[in-house]
């Protein structure tokens, strides 16, 4: 995808991870183009268009799970995507599920089992880091910690 940074890690080829940049969307200032967040005051129509633009760059078979980040340490398993969940990390064992977090001044941390059986993503702000969001994410995954890789 144009305007994205692809993860450079040793994950299996079926695991895709990337972080988008701000260009390529329709949101106006102060959201500046590719805003995916409904909660910041941007037009819901623009956010929906931006999310649709993102999903159009990937396979239509994919199901998207977005988070409403709360700057904590909560981790949610995605069995079937639903409305935005309130937590700071997601993990799934389901194929074709895209786990999404939104970041500005926080860091997205991607996780994958070396065998590709499960993936996770965490929204790592300072409050979540202090509360243990990364540790909780690894604990929630069923793979042994030694079999989980991460990309920052």
Question: Could you say what each language-model-derived stretch is?
Answer:
Residues 16, 96-98, 105-106, 114-120, ...:
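Surface-exposed, charge/polar-rich loops and edge strands
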Residues 44-124:
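Phosphate-centric recognition/catalysis
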Residues 28, 74-76, 128-131:
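Short acidic/glycine-rich loop or secondary-structure boundary segments that cap or lie
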Residues 13, 43-51, 130, 134:
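Generic structural signal for well-ordered, non-membrane alpha-helical segments
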Residues 14-17, 33, 64, 98:
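A residue-level signal for beta-strand positions that form part of recognition/binding surfaces
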Residues 29-34, 77-79:
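Short, glycine/acidic-enriched capping/hinge loops at junctions between secondary-structure elements
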Residues 1-19, 23-24, 29, 86:
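Conserved nucleotide-ligand handling architecture
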């Amino acid at each position: 995808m144009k305007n994205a940074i692809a993860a450079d890690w040793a994950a299996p080829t079926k695991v895709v991870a990337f972080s988008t940049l701000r260009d390529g969307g329709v949101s106006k200032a102060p959201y500046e183009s590719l805003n995916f967040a409904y909660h910041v005051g941007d037009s819901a129509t623009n956010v929906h268009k931006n999310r649709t633009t993102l999903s159009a760059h990937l396979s239509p078979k994919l199901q998207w799970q977005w988070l409403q980040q709360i700057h904590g340490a909560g981790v949610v398993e995605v069995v079937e995507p639903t409305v935005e969940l309130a937590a700071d990390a997601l993990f799934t064992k389901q194929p074709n599920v895209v786990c999404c977090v939104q970041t500005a001044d926080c860091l997205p941390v991607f996780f994958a089992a070396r065998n590709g059986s499960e993936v996770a993503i965490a929204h790592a702000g300072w409050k979540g880091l202090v509360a243990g969001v990364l540790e909780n994410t690894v604990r929630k995954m069923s793979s042994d910690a030694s079999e989980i890789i991460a990309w920052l």
